[in-house]
Amino acid sequence: MGAVSTELTPELAATIEEAFANRDRANMQPTIDFFADLLTKHPGNPYILYEVGGSYDTAGREEKAIEYYEQALPGLSGDTKRRCLLQYGSTLRNLDRFDESLEVFAAACKEFPESDSLRVFKALSLQAAGRKDKALATLLLLVADRLATPEIKRYEAAIRGNAEHLANL
């Protein structure tokens, strides 16, 4: 038997996509079982490790999810890595591990600076950690960066100035 692939083949991607599409968020155990079985067929595959973690996370079993996210992250890249970092940071927040969550989001935002979702979830972690001013500043900058309406553009300097002020409180 040869080495087990840690790649995401088109076939494996289709299998993962189908299982994800068919999951029942109210009853995640069949999805957990499916991905755990798939992992036995592809041991150490980071993409499957991520999906197992995500399934446990959705089921409310955050401590278990973290184990899988941590195993998956070194082997992931691109959008899957971004999603794993987001879910990992969010899960740490849900477990009141705010400093760790914020470290994950700081690194993730540096690696994926164009990710709006990372910035939103970073703001949630800042808020949960009691840093409401910095959370609001993060969201204000997101609005200024991404909401290009005439009204926002007119007040962009004021929005950015307020964001800077809040971030430094």
Model-derived segments and spans:
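Alpha-helical adaptor scaffolds
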Residues: 47-111
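Start-of-helix register in tetratricopeptide repeats
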Residues: 13, 47, 80-83, 117, ...
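TPR/TPR-like (Sel1-like) alpha-helical repeat modules
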Residues: 74, 127-150
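Residue-level signature for tetratricopeptide repeat
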Residues: 18-21, 55, 91, 125
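TPR-repeat structural position
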Residues: 25-28, 62, 98, 132
